[in-house]
């Protein structure tokens, strides 16, 4: 028995060493590498299991993803080139070029933009546009629930499929894990093409569970699109039994829908291995009344660059007057936290709004030390108290804004597939600013919250320990 015991320890030690070498060779951010090292060293056995399920890299998918991205960019690139008299204003040129150089995200002019700040406004508009569809409906969502709202959306899609409209739905297999398969089978049986994104089935489970499609995109007839923070579930309208829900979503009409279409079709190729590039999915541009300049930007763990994260850093470092941000989860990467500190210490009015109470306690504990650190540099921290604020937005200098699915955390910037719309338009920026200032009225300043400022030693120690694991949360 003694020999068996020692043999087991030797084998386990070899596995740990091999795994740690693999973590090092991945060449990730030092914080993430160190977090996995700590897990492997100080959580025996369970640490190995956690790494197998959540720690493996996505390099294998990168090549196929890049090929699909290149192919599906060609159509929207043609439309981009055809834009007449198109000249990006100087103040937006550097960030627009950043996104174009990273993954060929293209800016488009002549867009009409409508912003929704609650599910009560967004979902009736979505259903209305679904009802108008004549050619196709494309939906990409993290969560679609088998609840009253989910069934209403499903019924609307089934009705359009029966009318001959092409309906395609992508849902995230982890985000929608509570939704029974019968819900999706009913749609499939009625002619809707439905795919789960990266299904978590053995043996693929271990390599895929950590990389999720967090995007919330809808494209209708290639003319109207939606993007933002709301999934398809009742709580995005009514909230939860504990608290109400605050969120932000956007309706786009105009050429920027090409960007949404490209994002969906890249995901569609990934799940179905079917290329869709026909002209009918990129119809003639409908000129929006607002004439807004919009750039739809995606990011993913398969990308060479963290596109949206680098965009946020660029905005923070370029800001001259203010940057206002809303996020439900604040576990910033080093570049984001550094940029926030530098901006605030340079005299820029940097404000960060997070929920007073999150829906995940571990994330709340981990975020507190980041919040205090940002606050010490002069970032004004606001805690939203009128329910749970799930909104993901940023506005800067009355000049530009972004709304989408991206949280200010490691998961969104590094592990998840995300999508944001960037608006280079003073009118839209002022709208987003007004939304932020309205939310600020329902918030309290961090300095007024005793539990954040004066904490016992053991609590501070615990929060600092959990912070070490923030790259994994």
Name every feature range the model reports, one short phrase each:
Residues 185, 339-343, 369:
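Short, solvent-exposed amphipathic alpha-helical segments in soluble enzyme
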Residues 303, 307, 327, 331, ...:
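A short glycine-/small-residue-rich loop at the edge of a beta-strand within enzyme catalytic domains
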Residues 319, 329-351, 355-356, 360:
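Helical hairpin unit composed of two closely spaced alpha helices linked by a short loop
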Residues 325-327, 384, 403-404:
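Thr-Gly-centered strand-to-loop micro-motif
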Residues 346, 351-396:
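A beta-strand-loop signature enriched in Asp, Gly, Thr, and Trp
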């Amino acid at each position: 028995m003694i020999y068996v015991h020692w043999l087991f320890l030797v084998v386990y030690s070899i596995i740990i060493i091999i795994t740690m070498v693999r973590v090092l060779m991945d060449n990730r951010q030092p914080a993430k590498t160190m977090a996995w090292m700590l897990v492997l060293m100080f959580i025996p056995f369970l640490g190995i299991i956690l790494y197998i399920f959540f720690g493996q890299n996505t390099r294998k998918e990168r090549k196929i993803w890049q090929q699909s991205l290149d192919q599906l960019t060609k159509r929207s690139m043609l439309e981009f080139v055809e834009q007449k008299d198109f000249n990006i204003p100087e103040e937006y040129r550097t960030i627009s070029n950043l996104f174009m150089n990273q993954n060929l995200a293209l800016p488009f002019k002549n867009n009409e933009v409508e912003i929704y700040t609650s599910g009560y406004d967004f979902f009736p508009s979505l259903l209305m546009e679904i009802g108008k569809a004549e050619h196709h409906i494309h939906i990409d969502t993290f969560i679609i629930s088998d609840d009253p709202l989910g069934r209403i959306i499903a019924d609307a899609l089934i009705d359009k499929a029966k009318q001959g409209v092409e309906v395609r739905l992508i849902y995230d297999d982890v985000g929608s894990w509570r939704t029974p398969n019968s819900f999706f089978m009913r749609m499939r049986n009625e002619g809707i093409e439905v795919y789960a994104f990266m299904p978590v089935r053995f043996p693929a489970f271990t390599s895929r569970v950590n990389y999720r499609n967090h995007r919330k995109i809808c494209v209708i007839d290639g003319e109207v699109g939606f993007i933002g923070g709301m999934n398809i579930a009742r709580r995005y309208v009514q909230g939860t039994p504990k608290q109400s829900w605050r969120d932000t979503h956007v309706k786009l009409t105009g050429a920027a829908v090409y960007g949404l279409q490209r994002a969906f079709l890249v995901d569609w190729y990934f799940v179905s291995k079917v290329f869709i590039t026909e002209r009918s999915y990129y119809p003639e541009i409908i000129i929006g009344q607002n004439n807004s300049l919009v750039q739809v930007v995606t990011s993913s763990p398969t990308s060479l660059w963290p596109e949206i994260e680098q965009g946020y850093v660029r905005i923070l470092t370029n800001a001259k007057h203010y940057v206002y941000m809303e996020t439900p989860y604040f576990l910033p990467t080093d570049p984001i936290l550094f940029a926030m500190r530098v901006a605030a210490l340079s005299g820029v009015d940097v404000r960060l709004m997070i929920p007073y109470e999150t829906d995940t306690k571990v994330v709340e504990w981990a975020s507190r030390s980041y919040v205090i650190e940002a606050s010490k540099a002069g970032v004004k921290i606001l805690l939203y108290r009128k329910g749970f604020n799930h909104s993901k937005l940023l506005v800067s200098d009355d000049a530009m804004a972004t709304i989408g699915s991206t949280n200010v955390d490691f998961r969104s910037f590094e592990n998840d597939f995300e999508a944001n719309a960037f608006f280079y338009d003073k009118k839209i920026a002022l709208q987003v600013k007004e939304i932020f200032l309205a939310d600020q009225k329902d918030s309290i300043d961090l300095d007024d919250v005793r539990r954040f400022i004066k904490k016992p030693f053991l609590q501070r120690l615990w929060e600092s320990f959990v912070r070490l694991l923030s790259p994994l949360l």
